[in-house]
Amino acid sequence: MSKTILRLPQVMTECGLARSTVYLRIKQGLLTKPIPLGPRSVGWPQSEIEAINAARIAERSEMELKQLVKTLQANRQGGIRV
């Protein structure tokens, strides 16, 4: 699992989406919510973007994509290991 954080321009490039479409997909539950990096900056785990893109390439249904997004966001909670 990659620990790289992608900023919005990178996510737009990786997904082939415009800025407004990225945020629309988040609202629709088709893309994970960004994580805060600072007071005015956010990013997305690269592994999540890769998983979503792989599902899109595999032509998963909208319902399957929404379930994947829910699973990815739920998995964030268990990501801290010391």
Predicted regions: what is each one?
Residues Q28-I35:
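Short, solvent-exposed alpha-helical "recognition" segments
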Residues L24:
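Base-recognition residues in the alpha-helical recognition helix of bacterial helix-turn-helix
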Residues K27-Q28, A54:
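Residue-level detection of the helix-turn-helix DNA-binding "recognition helix"
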Residues M1-G16, T21, R40-V42, Q46-V82:
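Basic Lys/Arg-rich amphipathic helical interaction modules
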